[in-house]
């Protein structure tokens, strides 16, 4: 019965819906008519455009009629009407000169309705790179008699004519020719008034009078574009306007109705009550008369009709009640069904009155396409709606979830079966929960027997790890036994919970009870017992700890390594003290020993002095060291220890006899230089000490002060030094080479400056002899003493050293105030070397000559470098040994320059540049000739 009633009520509801829709539609149309009727105005504009396009199509023919009031006659018409019997070629030539446009060519197959680009660019032809039309049809006309052209030019003809298709003209346009044409046309028109009563239709229009009505030529395609723009901006045309409409002449795709037709269609929709709102009919020509064409292209914003309609129309609730009483009874019996949005209160179903609910509700975007809620709910009865069934999982929203009764009963049964349990907390709070494991979706997990066994093992491990008996628990055993019984009586059940506050079942309950009782007894005793205030004596750990304050166990190997390191460190400290005390007078005997950082003595075995004797020189004046006490850390050391130098990987370096000899010689040199500075403390604390073979040597240096002060004041250290101002040992081979070089240098100086002879005195020769003897004693390994050494060198070398030392002494006497004495630069001749002058008559491309020049140049540069180095080092060594590291270094280039002194004003002149300062590569073309050599060729 319900289905029959529903089928019978459906056509009634459809008719009611259509009537309601028609009423609402008429209301919206009336409101739109009250707001100046914008859509009708746009329709009038379209109708005016259609009429103008039809007029333009009628007037667009090849023969254009002239204005009735004008007396203008075209030259072309006069020529054709009153033509004398002349040859046709002359007529075509005149027509080509006066009646054609050179720049404008009109296509024959150009469509009559072409409208793009719009308006003022419509008659402009856009040049593209497409294939041009083959002008073979014009070739015969253009090439008949090109010599017969008159050379006249006119302005561009904007009007089309059939003569322009067959005429050619120049590209230049002139205003004078235009005025000539005007005069000619007026002359012929004045003379033709009497002869021809009816003027001949002209086909030539002047540019000033042409295209005045071009704005009215709106074609059908432009109207279509305007319609598309209106549709895009939100305007819609009513379907009733286009129903049963006959196409007029000139319209191709659609027609726009007039105002009378629109009013008739509105009367059908509005009824007799809405007829008074129809506006007066107006002629579209009068409407568009004062509107310029440029304003038609301005974008127009769509009217805000929907908002006004929403404000005026009130909300109306639609009650979807069935028409039969049976349906009313069934709807009363059923529960109230409402549509519930997520996390929002329920809302009744309201009617969509022109978008009111769409704008008011926040979820309107989902209901845009719904025209009417009644249309959607027509196929469903109100009593057939059922609430949605929710799943068992938890929901994130605040909506109510309907749970079936079966699940509620099952949950109640499980709660009744599980007994309530209490946990003995401090607050004694009890809570009843279901004991089981659950997933996140509130589903139970089945626990197998293997999982139970693993859980029991894990609980045992946790309990064994938590319970550790300490000293405090042993002291409180009596109190624990008294309180344990009380706690066990009070506790009934123990319950653990997970992170999500879910209960966890316990397997071994007795062990957990015991553990909790012990923990609580410890807390109670900690608060009440007086033993808490007393400090319990626990053994303190003295040693190293980690970052987490954990003790680091120290093994025996680590102790042995630390003992070795402390012994080496203490030996270095004692060596430094002994080295400092050697150079100072010590009246009182002091005890020297090895101590650790905590001032504990270190035991010295029998092997230690023998190894230390290779590196340490002990002064005889120092008192005997006292016997140190035994250190408990080093008492177990029985392994031999290595004292000496080690590599980066802590490997021992064996010291040979040659190294010991070199160390002894170096120590003697450093001690001799230190004695010159008024017996100040040694500046070389890091110098290794000599072997026990040279003990007598160092002792003699300390005991014989008076003997050495005389010699040290007269002698000075001669040699090279390192960057740390330490002397470098000079071997005999180097001395021989230096002697030969000095002899060559002195011979060169004697040849260049022969006017000033060299005078050698006796005193500096004796000093030089002593210095050479001392230097020779340094190199001889067989000699043990430093002072009493006899020279066995070549006398020639000695003479060279004497001369060099005399030059330094004389320089110091001449310039006592200068810290660095000046060295005179020897004069050289301005002539080029003989080996270089050979290139004048040979080609620069000769390979043999190139090789010889390069070899000679390198040799000269090396010799000049040696002279510069020797002069700077000898001069600076006389002044002070510390200035050696800051001495000027020669340049490392292959192009040598002359050694000049910057302190002299003559040498510092920028403009002065002699040929002797130039190498064969750097010589300028003004001063000397170029040899044609460059570094890029070899």
From Swiss-Prot:
Region: Disordered; residue ranges are 320-359, 409-434, 870-938
Could you state one GO cellular component term attached to this entry? Answer: nucleus
Q: Where are the BRCA2 repeats?
A: 537-571, 638-672, 713-747
InterPro entries attached here?
Answer: BRCA2 (IPR015525), BRCA2_repeat (IPR002093)
- The primary location reported for this protein is nucleus
Keywords on record? Cell cycle, Cell division, DNA damage, DNA repair, Meiosis, Mitosis, Nucleus, Repeat
Question: Residue spans with biased composition (Basic and acidic residues)?
Answer: 320-339, 409-425, 898-915
Query: Which superkingdom heads the taxonomic lineage of this protein's source?
Result: Eukaryota
The processes (GO biological process) annotated in the record are: cell division; DNA synthesis involved in double-strand break repair via homologous recombination; meiotic DNA repair synthesis involved in reciprocal meiotic recombination; meiotic recombination checkpoint signaling; regulation of DNA-templated transcription; response to camptothecin
Ranges of compositional bias, category Polar residues? 870-879
- Localization, UniProt: Nucleus
Query: Is Membrane set as a keyword in this record?
Result: no
Bias regions of kind Basic residues — which residues?
A: 926-938
State whether keyword Nucleus applies: yes
Positions of transmembrane segments? none
Q: How does it assemble?
A: Interacts with Rad9 and spn-A/Rad51.
Report the function annotation for this chain.
Involved in and required for double-strand break repair by meiotic and mitotic homologous recombination. During meiosis, has a dual role in the repair of meiotic double-stranded breaks and the efficient activation of the meiotic recombination checkpoint.
Name-wise, this protein is Breast cancer type 2 susceptibility protein homolog
Species of origin reads Drosophila sechellia (Fruit fly)
Q: What is the lineage of its organism?
A: Eukaryota, Metazoa, Ecdysozoa, Arthropoda, Hexapoda
What is the gene name? Brca2
């Amino acid at each position: 019965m319900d289905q029959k009633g529903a089928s019978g009520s459906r056509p009634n509801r459809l008719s009611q819906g259509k009537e309601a829709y028609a009423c609402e539609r008429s209301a919206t149309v009336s409101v739109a008519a009250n707001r100046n009727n914008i859509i009708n105005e746009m329709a009038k504009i379209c109708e005016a455009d259609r009429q103008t396009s039809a007029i333009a199509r009628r007037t667009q023919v090849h023969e254009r009629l002239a204005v009735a009031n004008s007396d203008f006659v075209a030259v072309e018409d006069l020529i054709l009407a009153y033509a004398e019997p002349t040859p046709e070629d002359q007529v075509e030539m005149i027509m080509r000169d006066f009646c054609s446009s050179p720049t404008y060519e009109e296509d024959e197959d150009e469509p009559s309705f072409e409208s793009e680009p719009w308006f003022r660019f419509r008659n402009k032809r856009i040049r593209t790179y497409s294939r041009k039309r083959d002008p073979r049809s014009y070739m015969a006309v253009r090439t008949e008699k090109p010599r017969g052209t008159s050379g006249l030019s006119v302005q561009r003809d904007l009007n089309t004519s059939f003569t322009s298709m067959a005429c050619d003209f120049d590209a230049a346009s002139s205003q004078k020719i235009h005025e000539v044409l005007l005069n000619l046309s007026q002359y012929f028109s004045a003379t033709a008034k009497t002869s021809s009563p009816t003027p001949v239709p002209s086909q030539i229009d002047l540019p000033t009078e042409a295209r005045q009505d071009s704005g009215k030529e709106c074609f059908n395609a432009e109207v279509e574009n305007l319609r598309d723009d209106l549709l895009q901006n939100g305007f819609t045309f009513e379907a009733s306007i286009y129903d049963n409409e006959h196409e007029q002449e000139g319209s191709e795709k659609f027609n726009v109705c007039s105002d009378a037709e629109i009013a008739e269609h509105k009367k059908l929709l509005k009824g007799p009550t809405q007829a008074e709102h129809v506006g007066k009919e107006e002629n579209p020509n009068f409407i568009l008369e004062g509107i310029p064409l440029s304003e038609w292209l301005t974008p127009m914003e769509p009217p805000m009709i929907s908002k006004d309609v929403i404000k005026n129309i009130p909300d109306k609730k639609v009650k979807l009640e069935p028409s039969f009483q049976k349906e009313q009874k069934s709807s009363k019996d059923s529960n109230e069904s409402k549509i519930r949005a997520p996390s929002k209160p329920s809302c009744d179903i309201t009617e969509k009155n022109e978008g009111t609910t769409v704008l008011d509700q926040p979820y309107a975007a989902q209901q845009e396409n719904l025209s009417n809620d009644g249309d959607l709910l027509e196929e469903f009865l109100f009593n057939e709606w059922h609430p949605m069934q929710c799943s068992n999982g938890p929901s994130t929203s605040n909506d109510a979830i309907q749970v079936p009764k079966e699940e509620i009963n099952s949950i109640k049964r499980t709660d009744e079966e599980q007994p309530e349990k209490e946990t003995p907390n401090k607050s004694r709070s009890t809570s009843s929960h279901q004991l089981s494991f659950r997933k996140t979706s509130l589903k139970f997990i089945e626990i197998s027997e293997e999982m139970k066994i693993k859980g029991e093992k894990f609980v045992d491990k946790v309990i064994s790890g938590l319970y550790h008996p300490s000293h405090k628990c042993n002291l409180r055993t009596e109190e624990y036994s008294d309180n344990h019984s009380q706690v066990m009586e009070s506790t009934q059940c123990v319950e653990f919970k997970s992170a999500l506050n879910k209960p966890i079942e316990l397997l071994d309950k007795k062990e957990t009870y015991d553990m909790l009782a012990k923990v609580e007894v410890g807390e109670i005793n900690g608060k009440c017992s007086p033993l808490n205030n007393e400090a319990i004596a626990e053994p303190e750990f003295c040693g190293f700890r980690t970052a987490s304050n954990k003790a680091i166990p120290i093994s025996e190997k680590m102790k042995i390594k630390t003992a070795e390191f402390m012994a080496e460190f203490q030996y270095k400290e004692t060596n430094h003290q002994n080295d400092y005390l050697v150079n100072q007078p010590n009246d009182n005997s002091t005890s020297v020993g090895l101590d650790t950082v905590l001032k504990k003595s270190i035991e010295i075995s029998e092997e230690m002095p023998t190894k230390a004797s290779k590196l340490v020189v002990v002064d005889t004046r120092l008192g005997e060291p006292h016997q140190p006490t035994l250190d408990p850390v080093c008492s177990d050391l029985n392994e031999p220890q290595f004292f000496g130098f080690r590599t980066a990987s802590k490997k021992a370096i064996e010291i040979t006899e040659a190294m010991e000899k070199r160390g002894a010689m170096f120590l003697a040199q450093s001690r001799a230089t230190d004695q010159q500075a008024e017996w100040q403390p040694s500046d070389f604390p890091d110098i290794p000490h000599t072997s026990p073979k040279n003990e007598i040597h160092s002792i003699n240096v300390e005991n014989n002060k008076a003997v050495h002060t005389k010699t040290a004041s007269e002698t000075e250290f001669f040699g090279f030094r390192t960057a740390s101002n330490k002397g470098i040992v000079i071997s005999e081979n180097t001395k021989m080479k230096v002697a030969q070089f000095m002899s060559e240098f002195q011979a060169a100086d004697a040849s260049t400056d022969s006017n000033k002879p060299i005078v050698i005195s006796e005193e500096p020769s004796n000093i030089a002899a002593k210095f050479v003897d001392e230097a020779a004693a340094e190199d001889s390994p067989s000699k043990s003493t430093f002072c009493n050494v006899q020279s066995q060198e070549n006398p020639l070398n000695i003479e060279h050293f004497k001369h060099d030392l005399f030059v330094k002494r004389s320089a110091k006497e001449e310039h006592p105030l200068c810290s660095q004495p000046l060295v005179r630069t020897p004069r050289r001749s301005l002539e080029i070397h003989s080996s270089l002058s050979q290139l004048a008559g040979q080609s620069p491309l000769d390979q043999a000559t190139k090789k010889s020049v390069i070899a000679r140049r390198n040799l000269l540069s090396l010799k000049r470098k040696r002279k510069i180095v020797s002069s700077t080092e000898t001069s600076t060594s006389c002044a002070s040994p510390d200035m050696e590291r800051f001495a000027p270094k020669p340049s490392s280039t292959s192009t040598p320059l002359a050694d000049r002194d910057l302190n002299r004003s003559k040498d510092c002149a920028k403009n002065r540049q002699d040929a002797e300062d130039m190498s064969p590569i750097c010589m300028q073309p003004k001063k000397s000739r170029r040899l044609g050599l460059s570094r890029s060729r070899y």
